[in-house]
Amino acid sequence: MAREPSFSIPARPRRRFPRRGGVEYDGQTLFRLVPGEPMSDEALADLLAETLAAGPYRYGDFLNLPMVLYLVRDQGTGDVFRASVRDGSIRLHVLPETDSAGLRRLYERLAERSGIEWEVDCQSSE
């Protein structure tokens, strides 16, 4: 059995509101969840959608992008973060107020639903 991954957040992005409108972020932290068995992006997108639909999540895919990108709110922890699928992994993108609990819970639900082990790595930049 693999060691449980840490979802400790080393750095948080900073939110900016440019004069021209919108919102931008300086810096990023993301957790890459890579399945222990190869899965296509389509299969990962289906797994993510099924896991989110099972709850306790409110989520939406609000942008017309060529890849899956959800804004997710864990109703149990109150954590809000983005989740995407790209290059054979599910990526959890930390927002300024995201805490580790919501990220960990989604990881646990994905692992339980898939029945496989996952490798988790954290990438952060300021």
Please describe what each predicted stretch is.
Residues 3-68:
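Short Lys/Arg-enriched alpha/beta "domain-start" segment
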Residues 16-18, 75-77, 121:
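Sparse, context-dependent recognition of short Cys/His-centered cofactor- or disulfide-binding micro-motifs
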Residues 38-43, 77-81, 98-105:
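Short, surface-exposed beta-strand/loop "edge" segments at domain boundaries and coil↔beta transitions
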Residues 54-96:
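Short, intrinsically disordered low-complexity segments
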Residues 85-126:
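Ampiphathic alpha-helical segments that act as solvent-exposed interaction surfaces
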